Amino acid sequence: MTPFTQHTGLVAPLDRANVDTDQIIPKQFLKSIKRTGFGPNLFDEWRYLDIGEPGRDNSTRPLNPEFVLNFPRYQGASVLLARENFGCGSSREHAPWALDEYGFRAVIAPSFADIFYNNSFKNGLLPIVLAEAEVDALFEQCLANEGYQLTVDLAAQRVRRPDGVEYSFDIDAFRKHCLLNGLDDIGLTLQEADAIGRFEQDHRARQPWLFGALQ
């Protein structure tokens, strides 16, 4: 997992509340358990004018010119600005996978659905909760200024606007540690590889009959 320390990126404003996981990545794309291949179908039913199918070449599909991520000014955005209850609906880890593969490093909103919020941290995507008034101010600035960028400083737990105004955000200390060091569940386990190896050796020595079939 790529470490997240500080990131400055173009902001895309998704001015919709209660965006659910089926809108983030529709159900027909959930057959794969790999973490890759979902970015092209992020917000598929909003980005395209037709119905997407797994394995289809998206380069030939008609784009929806009214969807924000298709606007030329937001191409290359890496910070998503959203409204309340982002990521609600069914539990699917594919949602943060799709956002991450598209290129988003952080999502800023007044609130998130709990399962999506937890899944995001496990996959290197930083969900940031700010006060609704602060999110409103960011929407206003983003819509008024083409090329609008924000700096997210995870170490300091701050979001900095181009005019220097900063907003602080809360994050669990353990989740912060994992993001700063690029540690997912597998990475955390591998940190204890030596201790796990010692336990296995001791376990085998104390209870060898359990391992007879493995000799």
Swiss-Prot record:
Coiled coil: none annotated. It is an enzyme of class 4 (lyase). The keyword Transcription does not apply. GO terms for biological process: L-leucine biosynthetic process. It catalyses: (2R,3S)-3-isopropylmalate = (2S)-2-isopropylmalate. Gene3D superfamilies: Aconitase, domain 4. Keywords: Amino-acid biosynthesis, Branched-chain amino acid biosynthesis, Leucine biosynthesis, Lyase. Pfam families: Aconitase_C (PF00694). The keyword Amino-acid biosynthesis applies. GO terms for cellular component: 3-isopropylmalate dehydratase complex. Pathway: Amino-acid biosynthesis; L-leucine biosynthesis; L-leucine from 3-methyl-2-oxobutanoate: step 2/4. GO terms for molecular function: 3-isopropylmalate dehydratase activity. Its EC number is 4.2.1.33. Catalyzes the isomerization between 2-isopropylmalate and 3-isopropylmalate, via the formation of 2-isopropylmaleate. PANTHER family: 3-ISOPROPYLMALATE DEHYDRATASE SMALL SUBUNIT, 3-ISOPROPYLMALATE DEHYDRATASE SMALL SUBUNIT 2-RELATED-RELATED. Heterodimer of LeuC and LeuD. Belongs to the LeuD family. LeuD type 1 subfamily. This is 3-isopropylmalate dehydratase small subunit. It comes from Xanthomonas oryzae pv. oryzae (strain KACC10331 / KXO85).
